[in-house]
Design a protein with these regions (language model features):
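Bacterial Sec-dependent N-terminal signal peptides
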Residues: 1-27
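N-terminal low-complexity segments enriched in Gly/Pro/Tyr/Ser
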Residues: 25-151
Length: 151
């Protein structure tokens, strides 16, 4: 009987471990029921990391072929163009992704912080609270894809 309970315990442990791994690897395209559902920030961060310049990043982000951007924040039935605005200050670049709602108003979509510390570069993206909810933060993993922390 001892070995039977040992195997049951082992089976329970492995099933719990597999369940938690499955939860940890949830699809990064999970819908939040917010306007930001039409722009996958994990995909945006991957495009950012692959782009040699901010201009090429903006072009890739808005290319019809990329299928990343499907935002329509001004409800005109057209996909909004996302502007990339860089605000450098010392060793930190604050890169703001914005959409023009009309001629006078813009809506920030997300902010990418890039900080250089010696030979290391830290990148963090924060989705706008109105579009993604509170504390929607992404940081690139050591691999080539981004990890995200949602609400």
């Amino acid at each position: 009987m001892k070995s039977s309970s040992f195997y049951h315990g082992l089976l329970f442990f492995f099933s719990m471990a597999i369940s938690s791994m499955a939860l940890a690897q949830q699809d990064s395209t999970a819908r939040l029921g917010l306007p930001g559902d039409n722009l996958n920030l994990a995909a945006v961060l991957d495009v950012f990391r692959q782009s040699p310049t901010l201009e090429s990043f903006e072009s890739a982000l808005n290319a019809d072929t990329s299928k990343i951007n499907n935002l329509d924040l001004n409800n005109d039935g057209k996909v909004d163009y996302i502007k990339v605005v860089d605000r450098p200050e010392e060793n930190i670049h604050t890169i703001v992704l914005q959409v023009d709602l009309n001629e006078k108003e813009t809506q920030d979509v997300a902010v990418i912080f890039v900080q250089k510390e010696g030979d290391n570069v830290k990148i963090q993206m924060i989705g706008d609270e109105d579009l993604y909810g509170k504390n929607y933060i992404l940081e690139p993993a050591e691999a080539t894809t981004a990890t995200e922390t949602t609400n």
